[in-house]
């Protein structure tokens, strides 16, 4: 079963993670932010598989997002995505935390 999930697209995993862990647990405004983060993942890394997320892939994602956003917005995006990634690490879907030592940039 783990193999199935590691081959899963990261944007699909993130969407499922929102539904499982955030739906009905956060305010609607916050949920809107999680959904917007999902839309950006679909736009920036539509083919990235969960198993392929490493520090370089994650930093490239942040850099692409930072090209169009202020630093604080990039920090918020990072925190939302990091939550899903840390759960994937805890669940054994990816071997280590690729968000460690991420550099937060912005316009």
PLM regions: where:
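Substrate-binding beta-hairpin/strand module that engages nucleic acids
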Residues: 102
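N-terminal core-binding DNA-recognition domain of tyrosine site-specific recombinases/integrases
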Residues: 2-11, 18-93
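Ca2+-coordinating acidic residues in Ca2+-binding motifs
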Residues: 57, 98, 106
């Amino acid at each position: 079963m783990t193999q199935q999930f590691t081959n899963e697209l990261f944007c699909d995993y993130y969407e499922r993670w929102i539904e499982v862990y955030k739906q009905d647990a956060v305010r609607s405004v916050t949920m809107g932010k999680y959904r917007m983060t999902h839309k950006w993942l679909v736009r920036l890394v539509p083919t990235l598989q969960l198993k392929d997320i490493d520090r370089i892939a994650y930093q490239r994602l942040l850099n692409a997002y930072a090209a169009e956003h202020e630093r604080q917005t990039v920090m918020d995006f990072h925190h939302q995505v990091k939550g899903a990634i840390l759960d994937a690490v805890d669940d054994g879907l990816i071997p280590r935390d690729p968000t460690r030592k991420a550099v937060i940039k912005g316009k």
